[in-house]
Protein backbone atom coordinates (compact mmCIF):
# COMPACT_ATOMS: atom_id res chain seq x y z
CA UNK A 1 0.00 0.00 0.00
CA UNK A 2 1.34 3.41 -0.95
CA UNK A 3 2.26 5.73 1.93
CA UNK A 4 0.54 9.12 1.97
CA UNK A 5 2.47 12.31 2.72
CA UNK A 6 0.73 15.60 3.43
CA UNK A 7 1.79 18.28 0.93
CA UNK A 8 1.31 21.58 2.74
CA UNK A 9 3.02 24.56 4.30
CA UNK A 10 0.12 25.38 6.58
CA UNK A 11 0.95 24.83 10.25
CA UNK A 12 -2.78 24.40 10.87
CA UNK A 13 -2.92 21.55 8.33
CA UNK A 14 0.25 19.98 9.67
CA UNK A 15 -1.05 20.05 13.22
CA UNK A 16 -4.41 18.68 12.08
CA UNK A 17 -2.88 15.68 10.33
CA UNK A 18 0.13 15.08 12.59
CA UNK A 19 -1.58 12.21 14.42
CA UNK A 20 -3.69 10.99 11.49
CA UNK A 21 -2.76 7.32 10.96
CA UNK A 22 -3.30 7.72 7.21
CA UNK A 23 -0.51 10.28 6.95
CA UNK A 24 3.05 8.93 7.02
CA UNK A 25 5.05 12.09 6.30
CA UNK A 26 5.04 15.73 5.24
CA UNK A 27 6.47 17.57 2.24
CA UNK A 28 6.89 21.26 1.50
CA UNK A 29 8.39 23.27 -1.35
CA UNK A 30 9.27 26.93 -1.97
CA UNK A 31 6.04 27.60 -3.88
CA UNK A 32 4.00 26.31 -0.95
CA UNK A 33 6.01 28.47 1.44
CA UNK A 34 5.46 31.54 -0.74
CA UNK A 35 1.73 30.85 -0.80
CA UNK A 36 1.70 30.67 3.00
CA UNK A 37 3.69 33.89 3.31
CA UNK A 38 6.68 32.18 4.95
CA UNK A 39 9.77 34.41 5.11
CA UNK A 40 11.75 32.85 7.98
CA UNK A 41 12.62 29.32 6.87
CA UNK A 42 14.33 28.22 10.08
CA UNK A 43 11.48 29.33 12.32
CA UNK A 44 8.95 27.69 10.03
CA UNK A 45 10.92 24.44 10.03
CA UNK A 46 11.13 24.42 13.82
CA UNK A 47 7.38 24.92 14.02
CA UNK A 48 6.72 22.10 11.56
CA UNK A 49 9.07 19.68 13.30
CA UNK A 50 7.56 20.46 16.69
CA UNK A 51 4.17 19.40 15.32
CA UNK A 52 5.11 16.44 13.13
CA UNK A 53 6.55 14.02 15.69
CA UNK A 54 8.97 11.56 14.13
CA UNK A 55 7.32 11.52 10.70
CA UNK A 56 9.68 12.29 7.80
CA UNK A 57 9.51 15.92 6.67
CA UNK A 58 10.97 17.26 3.42
CA UNK A 59 12.35 20.80 3.17
CA UNK A 60 13.78 22.05 -0.12
CA UNK A 61 16.96 24.03 -0.71
CA UNK A 62 16.42 27.54 -2.04
CA UNK A 63 19.72 28.08 -3.87
CA UNK A 64 20.40 27.66 -7.58
CA UNK A 65 24.19 27.37 -7.45
CA UNK A 66 25.55 23.96 -6.46
CA UNK A 67 28.00 25.24 -3.84
CA UNK A 68 25.24 27.10 -2.00
CA UNK A 69 22.87 24.17 -2.51
CA UNK A 70 25.36 21.94 -0.72
CA UNK A 71 25.69 24.38 2.17
CA UNK A 72 21.92 24.73 2.51
CA UNK A 73 21.43 20.98 2.24
CA UNK A 74 23.77 20.33 5.14
CA UNK A 75 22.10 22.98 7.27
CA UNK A 76 18.60 21.66 6.50
CA UNK A 77 19.72 18.11 7.29
CA UNK A 78 20.92 19.32 10.70
CA UNK A 79 17.40 20.35 11.66
CA UNK A 80 16.45 16.83 12.68
CA UNK A 81 16.97 13.09 12.07
CA UNK A 82 13.61 12.82 10.31
CA UNK A 83 14.39 15.66 7.88
CA UNK A 84 14.75 14.96 4.17
CA UNK A 85 16.54 17.53 2.04
CA UNK A 86 14.80 18.22 -1.24
CA UNK A 87 17.14 18.87 -4.14
CA UNK A 88 15.79 19.78 -7.60
CA UNK A 89 16.90 17.40 -10.35
CA UNK A 90 18.59 20.37 -12.09
CA UNK A 91 19.25 24.01 -11.41
CA UNK A 92 17.50 26.71 -13.46
CA UNK A 93 20.14 26.34 -16.18
CA UNK A 94 19.30 22.68 -16.67
CA UNK A 95 22.55 21.45 -15.08
CA UNK A 96 22.07 18.07 -13.40
CA UNK A 97 22.18 17.73 -9.63
CA UNK A 98 23.69 14.25 -9.93
CA UNK A 99 27.37 15.27 -9.44
CA UNK A 100 26.37 16.77 -6.08
CA UNK A 101 24.98 13.44 -4.88
CA UNK A 102 28.48 12.10 -4.22
CA UNK A 103 29.05 14.81 -1.63
CA UNK A 104 25.58 14.62 -0.09
CA UNK A 105 24.74 10.97 -0.57
CA UNK A 106 24.81 10.11 3.14
CA UNK A 107 22.04 12.62 3.87
CA UNK A 108 18.35 11.84 3.64
CA UNK A 109 17.70 13.23 0.17
CA UNK A 110 14.51 13.78 -1.78
CA UNK A 111 15.32 14.47 -5.44
CA UNK A 112 12.42 16.51 -6.77
CA UNK A 113 10.89 17.78 -10.03
CA UNK A 114 11.87 14.58 -11.86
CA UNK A 115 9.88 14.14 -15.07
CA UNK A 116 11.87 12.55 -17.90
CA UNK A 117 12.99 8.99 -18.54
CA UNK A 118 16.52 10.32 -18.99
CA UNK A 119 16.47 11.88 -15.54
CA UNK A 120 15.34 8.66 -13.87
CA UNK A 121 17.95 6.66 -15.78
CA UNK A 122 20.66 9.09 -14.67
CA UNK A 123 19.52 8.84 -11.05
CA UNK A 124 19.36 5.05 -11.21
CA UNK A 125 23.13 4.71 -10.80
CA UNK A 126 23.48 7.34 -8.09
CA UNK A 127 20.62 7.19 -5.62
CA UNK A 128 20.77 5.03 -2.51
CA UNK A 129 18.05 3.02 -0.78
CA UNK A 130 17.44 5.71 1.85
CA UNK A 131 16.83 8.40 -0.78
CA UNK A 132 13.48 9.44 -2.26
CA UNK A 133 12.93 10.30 -5.92
CA UNK A 134 9.90 12.55 -6.44
CA UNK A 135 8.46 11.97 -9.90
CA UNK A 136 6.04 14.76 -10.78
CA UNK A 137 3.51 12.31 -12.09
CA UNK A 138 0.58 14.71 -11.97
CA UNK A 139 2.37 17.26 -14.14
CA UNK A 140 3.54 14.53 -16.50
CA UNK A 141 -0.05 13.34 -16.90
CA UNK A 142 -1.14 16.93 -17.57
CA UNK A 143 0.86 16.56 -20.80
CA UNK A 144 -1.01 13.39 -21.79
CA UNK A 145 1.78 10.98 -20.86
CA UNK A 146 2.24 8.31 -18.22
CA UNK A 147 4.89 8.70 -15.51
CA UNK A 148 7.97 6.55 -15.11
CA UNK A 149 9.59 5.30 -11.90
CA UNK A 150 13.02 4.69 -10.36
CA UNK A 151 13.36 1.47 -8.37
CA UNK A 152 16.71 1.57 -6.47
CA UNK A 153 15.14 3.84 -3.85
CA UNK A 154 11.79 5.04 -2.57
CA UNK A 155 9.75 6.59 -5.36
CA UNK A 156 7.27 9.35 -4.64
CA UNK A 157 4.28 10.28 -6.84
CA UNK A 158 4.20 14.08 -6.68
CA UNK A 159 1.64 16.66 -7.78
CA UNK A 160 -1.37 14.36 -7.50
CA UNK A 161 -4.46 15.83 -9.11
CA UNK A 162 -7.20 13.46 -7.95
CA UNK A 163 -7.85 10.51 -5.63
CA UNK A 164 -7.48 8.10 -8.57
CA UNK A 165 -3.79 8.96 -8.59
CA UNK A 166 -3.49 7.03 -5.32
CA UNK A 167 -4.74 3.94 -7.14
CA UNK A 168 -2.37 4.56 -10.04
CA UNK A 169 0.57 5.09 -7.69
CA UNK A 170 -0.15 1.70 -6.11
CA UNK A 171 -0.52 0.00 -9.49
CA UNK A 172 2.75 1.49 -10.78
CA UNK A 173 4.69 0.45 -7.68
CA UNK A 174 5.30 3.84 -6.10
CA UNK A 175 6.17 3.86 -2.41
CA UNK A 176 4.78 7.30 -1.53
CA UNK A 177 2.24 9.79 -2.84
CA UNK A 178 1.86 13.41 -1.74
CA UNK A 179 -1.66 14.75 -1.27
CA UNK A 180 -2.88 18.25 -0.54
CA UNK A 181 -5.44 18.68 2.26
CA UNK A 182 -8.32 18.88 -0.22
CA UNK A 183 -7.38 15.49 -1.69
CA UNK A 184 -6.93 13.95 1.75
CA UNK A 185 -10.47 15.09 2.51
CA UNK A 186 -11.64 13.09 -0.52
CA UNK A 187 -9.97 9.83 0.53
CA UNK A 188 -13.23 8.71 2.12
CA UNK A 189 -14.61 8.41 -1.41
CA UNK A 190 -12.13 5.70 -2.40
CA UNK A 191 -13.99 2.50 -3.34
CA UNK A 192 -17.32 4.14 -2.50
CA UNK A 193 -20.33 2.20 -3.80
CA UNK A 194 -21.13 3.91 -7.11
CA UNK A 195 -24.84 3.11 -7.00
CA UNK A 196 -25.05 4.86 -3.64
CA UNK A 197 -22.92 7.72 -4.95
CA UNK A 198 -25.26 8.06 -7.93
CA UNK A 199 -28.29 8.19 -5.65
CA UNK A 200 -26.64 10.83 -3.46
CA UNK A 201 -25.87 12.90 -6.56
CA UNK A 202 -29.47 12.70 -7.79
CA UNK A 203 -30.67 13.72 -4.32
CA UNK A 204 -28.26 16.67 -4.31
CA UNK A 205 -29.49 17.92 -7.68
CA UNK A 206 -33.10 17.52 -6.59
CA UNK A 207 -32.47 19.37 -3.34
CA UNK A 208 -30.58 22.21 -5.02
CA UNK A 209 -33.29 22.62 -7.64
CA UNK A 210 -36.09 23.25 -5.18
CA UNK A 211 -35.73 27.02 -5.26
CA UNK A 212 -35.76 27.29 -9.06
CA UNK A 213 -39.05 28.09 -10.84
CA UNK A 214 -39.95 26.38 -14.11
Describe the predicted segments one by one.
Residues 35-46, 65-71, 89-105, 115-125, ...:
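Active-site-adjacent beta->alpha loops and helix N-cap segments on the catalytic face
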Residues 150-214:
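C-terminal alpha-helical cap/extension of soluble enzyme domains
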Residues 21-25, 53, 79-83, 102-110, ...:
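Glycine-enriched alpha-helix->loop->beta-strand junction motifs that scaffold or abut catalytic
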Residues 1-56, 64-66, 70:
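Conserved N-terminal beta1-alpha1 strand-loop-helix module at the mouth
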Residues 30-33, 113-115, 129-143, 173-194:
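Glycine-rich phosphate-binding active-site loops on the catalytic face of alpha/beta enzymes
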Amino acid sequence: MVAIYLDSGSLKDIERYADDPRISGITTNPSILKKEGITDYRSFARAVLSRSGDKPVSFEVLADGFREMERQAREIASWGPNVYVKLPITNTRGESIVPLLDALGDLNLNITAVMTVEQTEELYEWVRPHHIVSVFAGRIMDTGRLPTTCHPCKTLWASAREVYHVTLAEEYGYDIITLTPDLIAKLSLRHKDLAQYSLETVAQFHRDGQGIAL
